[in-house]
């Protein structure tokens, strides 16, 4: 897109006159924009000039206010607000100056022209060092430029007649004068011209008004600007950013960065860099030999300063920037031999006397003017003028009476008095009152109410008579309207209006008196009949009025007759002008008879004259197209042949229409009947069910569950426990085996249901390596698995003999031994013999299992403890428990645990539970209600071990019945699969 900015502006941005004869320097604030941060810029479809985008009054923050939903090139009030306000990260403020040069043809006009107006090229987002990822935009020659920015100006001007404002350019330009919109050229557009004569704005000459200028460049590819101005713009004050009446927030300045008191209070050095305040870490560098610095938070740097030498009239200090002593002279000081003489009151300056001491003198303030009072204040001579004083050569003449002022005598050494109260006018009397001259008009009243009394400087008093005036007693009756003449009444004390009579005796005339000259007028009434004492006025000529003949006063109406004697015309009288018209009747046919006409109302049934013309005949219009797949009809005389959808036109006068495409209707071979043809939905597969869905004729193919394609027939499995497979010849065969659902777990019942294989666990069953073993709640008489032997189930009895004749030994139901003390019993002293040493052999279980059993014995897991047993105890079928092995990890007959010989973990003293070494491959040890049990490794319902519970404080793993358990449910989730839930107690 070719785009121009050719602006001829009569304005001053924010300016400073460098040379009042040659140039004007204009200060502007630019906000650099980029399409990647504000999508109001580089719009794909600019759209041209868009007036009315902003409100006619300037906003409270002196920027334009967007009118909502007015432009497709402005996305929202938020994006528009970023054009002329500081938004860190969205735009960048940049100060800019334009120099206007005085016109050579008109010295009151200054101008600036630039055919490549890119004021911030290489700056802001165009600086690739700081913003390397911002897009580059180029002109038609391929030269990169910064095309996206908004410029704003705020100033004041004193209006003078003849000021004008003219510009020619493109893109958004708004100018406000006195905060009112005077130039409205919004949008992205081509060149447009506007000129303003400020004389038409209703401004007061010499009065100061605010001037606000806003301009945005929002699109490629060219930029031109030409400015002219005759307006004298000024600014009351600039902020540190160079913005007229700004608040200093549009840029990084010394006040908000370098000299920010908060930085100094915390010993931080800050300076502006790329319009961003960069701060250092807190520090107070030493500046010896003058100072040593210490940082005190919220106070700043504290320094110890040296004392510098000085003379009598000098102040000395150590410069912290140069680290050197510097001296400055003391104002109004004279160095005398005996010390400094400092003048504190300049009206009495101090000086040295001959002895080197200070003496005071007086300042001479005489201005040799006799009309001033001369005084001295703070060393400055003040000459106060004496009111009403004339300065003569040798004296001052002061006037005390303004009617008789004092003036200088001819010699200038004395005063004379003047007389001023005489205006030399005939019509005034002259007086002097309280020192002021009074000139009072003379009284010319002739006591005549019908005269106007005035005074003429040449003639004196003049008495001019009033027209149409009658002098009454103490008042004048003046007639201003001769249609209502004023006369004296009530013995001359009152004026009364008497209307003028203008009746001409004609009932058909409108009589009136014309003010103010009193002329009678008689207007003849239109369409009026004079009936003597009254009139009859016709308002509607289709019903004229006439005088009655019965002696009454009621007018008679006679309707006007309109008839052209034609049967096919409509005769009417038009009110109120009474004109007769004859309108032809549409669709009417005149017959042979003179007054006979036939009117057609329905063109599908036209009306015609009879053969002899004495009557009308109704006929019918034929619309048959002889197509049996159309519906023939006549509407308002128009034939319609609507095509019947999905219809086949047969040969013998019928049409076959299909309403359901699952059953299509076609013509029979003879063409006189329709026949039905079903839609073929067969997909050629045996394991699908075909269905046609009407009326659209959509074929669906539903897969038959558990069906496989065989050569001869489809094979459908109705019972998952009896699957059907393809035979060698393509026929169906049943494929049933006994081991289909066997999970190789002796403690489960394996069944096949409609859902497939189901496995139900037997309660109280332990899965041994060679069959199952059902346990009992009686832990004193226990069934367990022989993991180290034949892997079958065997029975054990817990012995609780403590070899103490004074105790009664009990095996509790919980599996604990209880020794009841007997009364009146004495325990004999035993002979102390060391326990025999049992040395493990190579035939015992590995060191990670039972380390306590010698050859010929095996380890059993009883109540969670490993214990050593021999094969039998002499024929009763119950293994006999033996002593353990010596060492720190085994028990002995005299140990505190009763010499059970079970394995203990080093340093813990806790009985070792069953672990992975006691369960075959694919199984793991779980403890259910205190009883160890090998279960499948993926058995998710039981996952706590006694060892885990013991680490929680000597607890044991138990299972409780799960209330959420759902038996025989295929695809159970979470804990609904588990009949028991593990818990530590």
Swiss-Prot record:
Predominant localisation class: secreted
UniProt domain PA14: residue ranges: 102-247
Localization terms from the record: Secreted
Glycosylation sites: 127, 309, 424, 491, 517, 527, 592, 620, 649, 696, 735, 767, 786, 824, 842
Residues in the signal sequence: 1-20
Record key words, sorted: Glycoprotein, Secreted, Signal
NCBIfam families named among the record's database cross-references: Fibro_Slime
Family, as annotated: Belongs to the prespore-cell-inducing factor family.
Protein name: Protein psiQ
Organism: Dictyostelium discoideum (Social amoeba)
Encoding gene, per UniProt annotation: psiQ
């Amino acid at each position: 897109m070719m785009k121009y900015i050719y602006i001829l502006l009569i304005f001053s941005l924010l300016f400073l006159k460098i040379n009042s004869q040659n140039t004007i320097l204009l200060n502007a604030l630019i906000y650099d924009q980029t399409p990647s941060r504000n999508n109001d810029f580089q719009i794909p479809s600019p759209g041209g000039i868009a007036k009315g985008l902003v409100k006619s009054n300037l906003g409270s923050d002196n920027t334009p206010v967007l009118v909502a939903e007015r432009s497709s090139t402005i996305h929202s009030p938020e994006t528009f607000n970023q054009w002329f306000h500081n938004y860190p990260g969205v735009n960048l403020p940049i100060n800019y100056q334009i120099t206007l040069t005085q016109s050579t043809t008109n010295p009151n006009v200054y101008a600036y022209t630039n055919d490549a107006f890119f004021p911030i090229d290489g700056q802001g987002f165009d600086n690739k060092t700081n913003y390397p990822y911002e897009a580059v935009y180029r002109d038609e020659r391929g030269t990169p430029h910064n095309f996206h920015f908004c410029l704003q100006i705020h100033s004041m001007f004193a209006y003078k007649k003849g000021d004008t404002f003219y510009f020619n350019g493109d893109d958004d330009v708004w100018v406000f004068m006195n905060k009112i919109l005077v130039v409205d050229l919004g949008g992205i557009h081509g060149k447009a011209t506007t000129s303003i004569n400020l004389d038409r704005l209703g401004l007061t000459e010499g009065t100061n008004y605010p001037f606000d200028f806003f301009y945005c460049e929002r699109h490629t590819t060219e930029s031109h600007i030409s400015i002219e101005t005759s307006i004298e713009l000024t600014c009351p004050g600039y902020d540190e950013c160079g913005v007229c009446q700004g608040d200093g927030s549009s840029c990084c300045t010394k006040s908000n960065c370098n000299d920010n008191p908060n930085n100094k209070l915390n010993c931080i050095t800050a300076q502006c860099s790329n319009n961003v305040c960069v701060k250092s870490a807190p520090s107070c560098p030493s500046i010896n030999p003058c100072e040593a610095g210490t940082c005190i938070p919220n106070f700043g740097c504290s320094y110890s300063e040296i004392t510098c030498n000085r003379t009598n009239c000098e102040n000395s200090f150590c410069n912290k920037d140069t680290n050197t002593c510097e001296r400055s002279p003391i104002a109004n000081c004279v160095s005398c031999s005996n010390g400094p003489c400092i003048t504190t009151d300049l009206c009495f300056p101090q000086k040295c006397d001959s002895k080197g001491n200070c003496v005071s003198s007086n300042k001479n303030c005489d201005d040799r003017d006799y009309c001033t009072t001369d005084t001295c204040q703070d060393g400055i001579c003040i000459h106060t003028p004496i009111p009403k004083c004339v300065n003569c050569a040798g004296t001052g003449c002061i006037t005390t009476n303004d009617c008789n002022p004092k003036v200088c005598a001819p010699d200038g050494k004395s005063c004379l008095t003047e007389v001023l109260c005489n205006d030399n006018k005939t019509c005034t009397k002259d007086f002097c009152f309280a020192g002021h001259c009074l000139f009072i008009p003379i009284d010319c009243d002739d006591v005549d109410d019908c005269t106007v009394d005035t005074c003429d400087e040449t003639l004196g008093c003049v008495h001019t008579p009033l027209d149409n005036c009658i002098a009454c007693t103490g008042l004048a009756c003046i007639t201003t309207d001769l249609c209502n003449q004023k006369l004296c009444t009530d013995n001359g004390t009152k004026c009364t209006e008497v209307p003028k009579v203008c009746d001409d005796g004609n009932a058909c005339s409108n009589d009136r008196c014309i003010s103010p000259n009193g002329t009678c007028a008689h207007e003849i009434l239109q369409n009026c009949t004079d009936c003597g004492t009254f009139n009859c006025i016709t308002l509607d000529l289709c019903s004229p009025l006439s005088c009655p003949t019965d002696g009454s006063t009621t007018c008679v109406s006679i309707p006007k007759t309109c008839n052209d004697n034609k049967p096919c015309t409509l005769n009417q009288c038009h009110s109120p002008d009474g004109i007769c018209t004859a309108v032809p009747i549409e669709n009417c046919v005149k017959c042979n008879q003179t007054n006979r006409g036939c009117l057609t109302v329905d063109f599908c049934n036209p009306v015609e004259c009879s053969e002899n013309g004495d009557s009308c005949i109704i006929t019918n219009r034929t619309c048959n197209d002889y197509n049996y797949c159309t519906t023939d009809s006549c509407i308002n005389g128009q034939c319609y042949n609507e095509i019947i959808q999905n219809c086949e036109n047969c040969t013998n006068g019928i049409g076959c229409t299909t309403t359901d495409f699952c059953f299509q209707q076609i013509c029979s071979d003879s063409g006189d009947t329709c026949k039905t043809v079903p839609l073929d939905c067969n997909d050629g597969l045996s394991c699908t069910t075909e269905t046609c869905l009407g009326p659209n004729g959509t074929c669906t193919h539903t897969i038959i569950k558990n069906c496989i394609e065989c050569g001869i027939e489809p094979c459908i499995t109705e019972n998952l426990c009896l699957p059907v497979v393809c035979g060698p010849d393509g026929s169906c065969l049943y494929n049933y085996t006994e081991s289909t659902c066997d999970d190789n777990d002796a403690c489960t019942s394996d069944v096949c249901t409609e859902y497939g294989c189901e496995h139900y666990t037997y309660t109280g069953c332990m899965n041994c390596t060679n069959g199952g073993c059902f346990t009992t709640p009686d832990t004193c008489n226990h069934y367990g698995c022989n993991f180290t032997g034949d892997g079958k189930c065997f029975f054990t009895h817990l012995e609780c003999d403590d070899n103490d004749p004074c105790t009664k030994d009990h095996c509790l139901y919980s599996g604990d031994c209880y020794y009841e003390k007997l009364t009146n019993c004495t325990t004999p002293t035993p002979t102390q013999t060391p326990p025999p040493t049992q040395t493990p052999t190579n035939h015992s279980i590995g060191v990670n299992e039972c380390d306590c059993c010698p050859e010929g014995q095996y380890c059993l897991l009883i109540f969670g403890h490993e214990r050593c047993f021999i094969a039998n105890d002499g024929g009763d079928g119950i293994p006999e428990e033996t002593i353990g092995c010596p060492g720190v990890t085994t028990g002995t007959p005299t140990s505190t645990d009763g010499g059970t010989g079970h394995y203990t973990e080093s340093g813990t003293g806790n009985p070792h539970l069953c672990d992975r070494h006691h369960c075959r491959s694919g199984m793991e040890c779980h403890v259910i209600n205190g009883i160890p049990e090998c279960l499948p490794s993926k058995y998710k319902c039981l996952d706590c071990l006694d060892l885990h519970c013991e680490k929680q404080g000597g607890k044991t793993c138990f299972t409780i019945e799960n209330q959420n358990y759902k038996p025989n449910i295929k695809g159970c989730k979470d804990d609904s699969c588990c009949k028991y839930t593990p818990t530590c107690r």
